[in-house]
Amino acid sequence: MDGMLTEGTSAIPPPQPPLEPIERPPTPPPLPPDESALPPPPTDPAPPPPPPDSLAPPPPPEDVPRSTYTVPVVVKKKKVGWGSSKSTTPLSVEELLRKKKEADEAASRPKFLTKSQREKLALEKRAKEIEHERRIRAASTNGSMMSDSNGGGGNSNGRASPTTRYDNVNGSSRTSIPTAPRALRGEIPTAPAAMRSSQAKNNDPRPGNKVPSDSAATGEKRTAPEDAQALLTRQRYMGADQTSSFSAKKKRRRTTERKFNFEWNADEDTSPDYNPLYQNRSEMNFFGRGRLAGFSDDVVDSAAKRYAKALEDRDLEAGSARAREILEMERRRREEGGRNGLDLHWSQKRLDQMRERDWRIFKEDFNISTKGGSIPNPMRSWGESGLPKRLLEIIDKVGYKDPSPIQRAAIPIALQNRDLIGVAVTGSGKTAAFLLPLLVYIAELPRLDEFEWRKSDGPYAIILAPTRELAQQIENEARKFCNPLGFNVVSIVGGHSLEEQSFSLRNGAEIIIATPGRLVDCIERRILVLSQCCYVIMDEADRMIDLGFEEPVNKILDALPVSNEKPDTEEAEDARAMSQHLGGKDRYRQTMMYTATMPSAVERIARKYLRRPAIVTIGNIGEAVDTVEQRVEFISGEDKRKKRLADILASGEFRPPIIVFVNIKRNCDAVARDIKQMGYSSVTLHGSKTQEQREAALASVRNGNTDVLVATDLAGRGIDVPDVSLVVNFNMATNIESYTHRIGRTGRAGKSGVAITFLGNEDADVMYDLKQMLMKSSISRVPEELRKHEAAQSKPTKAGGGQKRLDEGGMSAPKTGSGW
């Protein structure tokens, strides 16, 4: 054999195709197997495994002629080591790059095969698959025959023992009990039967080459029930597998397979050129943005003219008439603003062009929010208010140019005889908002001087105010409108004698402005009756409750006649039903309430005496106006605060008048004396002053004779001092509502103002609310001391079951009933 494997083997001719495999001597036949347990025998005998490379090929058999026997060609491996020489010349880089480039080009170029070549490759591939399956089948047959010949797990008589039957769970024994579905019973064993039994007994699997099964050979993936259950459990708790199964080589159905293709191209269509009307008609709609593609009116007009000319050229008779109609429509469209004015601002539209969207934008611009049923839209100007012409002339003469937000929303509602709750910040024009509808209401009633008995039946309307100063201020404002109309207005407040006020009522009065306490005294002394009162207005209702006037207010409202009371039904929201006269003369009573905050006591009064009220809110409840800049300084001690006040007044930044607020009466005179020592004139205003002293102090400040007004919370509500540039809280208010009304004395009527507050540790109860108010203001800043203070981090809890602390003066009202 060594001579056959010498270096002369290169001269041997190429090998010929192999002949039939060599027949081996026959082996004794095994026991007849169970045909139902064994796979079918192969049709062709399986060839023996090839010999390893290290062994020499076997000699030719004696019974085969030498001429037909072909010696397999074996290429001798070159020996490396002793007596061999290794090539030391490496390949150059250029040659490697050239070879790589050629290989890439060859791989990138498509290889075209003929039909015969493709069929040949397919046949070769199929032959390899068949050969592979045949080898697998032969290996499984040989393994089962070897296990039977060795008597694996059987008795001497060839039968399997009972123990072996139940031990061979994997199906290696042909007599074992089936433990799997029929489709999985024929899996190929992984080892001989003797080894399987020993492995199962010792529970020690031995490593080895696993023979692939039929399912693996055919490419099918079978999943055991246990594996499927484990997969579902893993997906349930760990989520679905994120690995994508997308394959670019996967054959997909083309979406254009069933698409019908015409024999002619779309570019060959000449029909648009036939009619000139469709050439450039709609090309503008696809460019730009806006009302009509963002083009100006000139472009739109030119397009309309071009379209009209095309119509005339097409048809001289009917086309000319149609062209004139189109030009007329375009002219009307330009006059109306296009698409009924959708592209115009609400201030440029007519009233009939206003839509729901425009009214919503209008309310957002003025920060108006309404609540209730059947509420009319607000008015945009005095001309759209619906007021009588005579009253509009007086408004123009007084100098009211544009209505304020509360006037825009409240006047149209009040003109429909609806009960109203107006929630607005201080200095927003609430006085005119309830005076003008009141004058329209009483103008339709009989005059008091028509009959003598009407004068003794009392007024048509009463206006309640919490303080004397506010009542007199409302009286002065009402006289501007009532005197030209011939109505009589009388104020009934404390500080004046009852005889003087009784003399003022001798000729009757259509409108009475009073404080709750003095009005109750007049009713109890039979000086005044409310037999024909049909209009009630409560201004600063929350302030009246804070001053302890809840019980007097209830007495006044209970003294009103019940014959003209509104029903608590949906009719109270019907403007036409509420405008009717009862019995031909009387009208339904109308009640209005204006407030800056809504405490529970005010809600109780509103629930008891108002019928289906419309609620109008301007801004946010309890917030200061945006025209006031709030500044907070931490200063403890009276001396330091007085020194800081002197620096503020001496800075020259603020022009008089200036208001300084303190908490207690005795501090007013002390602070006023210190201000006079600084070189500024000052007056005081508090509850211990007489009515004449109060009026004189306010008059001196309004006339410009006094620079600084030092006051308690008495001046914090409703007192209108024009052009106040600065408010100084020498002592912080005891609650945030009083603070809101204090700083509301400045920044009124749209003007700007500044409020400076001196804060100390004794004001811990209001620090949280003060911090929240400063954060909501767009022009104010929260100081670091207040931001980091412990009391400003959470809202304090009220002691005593939430009882609200009242301001100075007044009597406490019993808190009965539930909130509204």
Swiss-Prot record:
The short motif DEAD box is annotated over 539-542
Motif stretch (Q motif): 380-408
> Region (Disordered) spans which residues?
1-70, 101-255, 784-820
Report the Gene3D superfamilies cross-referenced here.
P-loop containing nucleotide triphosphate hydrolases (3.40.50.300)
Q: Which intervals carry biased composition (Polar residues)? A: 159-178
Report whether Nucleotide-binding shows up as a keyword of the record.
Answer: yes
Task: List where Basic and acidic residues composition bias occurs.
Answer: 116-136
E.C. no? 3.6.4.13
The function of this protein is: ATP-dependent RNA helicase involved in mRNA splicing. May destabilize the U1/5'-splice site duplex to permit an effective competition for the 5'-splice site by the U6 snRNA, resulting in the switch between U1 and U6 at the 5'-splice site. May also act to unwind the U4/U6 base-pairing interaction in the U4/U6/U5 snRNP, facilitating the first covalent step of splicing.
Q: What is this protein called?
A: Pre-mRNA-splicing ATP-dependent RNA helicase PRP28
Tell me what organism the protein belongs to: Coccidioides immitis (strain RS)
- Which gene specifies this protein's sequence? PRP28
